[in-house]
Structures are given as C-alpha cells and as structure tokens.
A protein has these predicted regions:
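N-terminal amphipathic/basic-hydrophobic helices that include classical n-h-c signal peptides
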Residues: 1-16
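A short beta-loop-alpha structural element at the N-terminal edge
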Residues: 19-31
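Active-site rim helix/loop that mediates acceptor-substrate recognition in acyltransferases
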Residues: 32-39, 43-81
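Conserved glycine-rich acetyl-CoA-binding loop
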Residues: 75, 101-112, 124, 140-141
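A conserved beta-turn-beta hairpin within the catalytic core of GNAT-like acetyltransferases
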Residues: 85-94, 105, 124
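Conserved acetyl-CoA-binding loop-helix of GNAT-fold acetyltransferases
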Residues: 95, 100, 106-119, 130-131
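Conserved active-site alpha-helix within GNAT-family acetyltransferase domains
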Residues: 123-127, 132-157
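C-terminal "cap" of GNAT-fold acetyltransferases
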Residues: 152-186
Length: 186
C-alpha cells in the first residue's frame, strides 16, 4: 500500500511527492546504507543501528507491516522500524530506529514516517509505542514521558528521553519495565 505525502523542498521550493510504503526485501541493502548514513553524525549513536535493523528483521519481534520506507523521486530517503516489546505481559511497540538521509532531514519526513507507522499500529491493535530519543523531536508526534504511561526503562535514563505514545486513546495505564527483543542487547 502506498501513502503519498506532499513535501516542499526547502532549498528550491519545488514540490515533490513522498511515498511511504512497506519495506520490501529488495530494499534491504539500500535501507542498510540509509540507516548507516543517517546516524553517521548523530549526537547519540553506537554506530550499529544498521546492523540492529538487520538483526530485528530476523527476530520474532519483527512486524513487516511496521517496517516502512519513505521514497522521494524513486529514491529511498528514510526508514522507520517498530518491533514488538512487552510490558507486564502486554505487547507494545518499540520504535527504533527512525532514519532519514541527512540531505532530507528537517523536512517532515521522519514525522510522516511516524504518523503512518502509528496509524498502521493502531489498526493492528497495538496500544503503545515506546521510543528512546530527543524529547523535543518525538513530542511533535505526541510522545510523552513513558513514566506517565506506567512504562519503565530496563536501564538508567532520564524521564524526558524515554517516551511513549498511547496509540488508541485508551485509559489503560501499564505498570512495568519494558522488555525489548534480545537483538537490542539490553
């Protein structure tokens, strides 16, 4: 399924179409390089995000419908991956990583990927998405401190950086530590 989004190119003010679609096996090599390049100069990175994506694709937590790419002018410029995680027996989603090529950042592509991913996740019946990242950025997509949803990290982290999003508006508050797929190494 294709999800077109109109994006303005800031430098030229041209308008182009951004397509968000499910990742396909033939995209894997390109996505590997997109993720690697997106994190090369990131403030917080272990330099291994591209290998994490490859490992998660082979895991039980992988959800093909929630591995999405952003395509502009027939070029993959972004990728997002949501995988299964668990909080006290309840399946939730872990958003990691979100990658956009440096030349395409600050144009709303990451937010578009999140919005489409959240929509699909809601349709699939998931209640929460959890992310570790910059609060100023992820709050634009509705993420709040995970502690407000009763979700705790399995590691030391400040409250602002560990966030969650209630995908269906339910009042169900969880109470426990998130368990990530073993591919995360946590």
């Amino acid at each position: 399924m294709l999800f077109p989004v109109i994006v303005k190119k800031l430098k030229t003010m041209e308008v182009s179409i951004l397509i968000i679609r499910q990742e396909r096996p033939e995209d894997y090599d390109t996505v590997y390089h997109v993720v690697k390049e997106a994190f090369e100069n990131a403030e917080y990175t272990d330099g291994n995000e591209q290998n994490l994506v490859a490992a998660l694709r082979k895991s039980k937590s992988f959800i093909p419908e929630l591995s999405l790419v952003a395509v502009e002018d027939e070029k993959i410029v972004g990728h997002i991956l949501f995988t299964k995680a668990v909080v006290q027996g309840v399946e939730v989603l872990a958003l990691a990583p979100l990658s956009v090529l440096p030349d395409y950042q600050n144009r709303g592509i990451g937010l578009s990927l999140m919005k489409e991913g959240h929509s699909i996740a809601h349709k699939l019946g998931y209640e929460y998405s959890v992310v570790l990242g910059h609060s100023k950025y992820y709050s634009k997509a509705g993420y709040i401190p995970a502690s407000e949803c009763g979700i705790k990290a399995p590691f030391e982290v400040d409250d602002e950086s560990f966030m969650a999003l209630n995908l269906n508006g339910s009042q169900n508050k969880l109470n426990g530590v998130i368990e990530y797929d073993k591919a995360f190494g946590i």
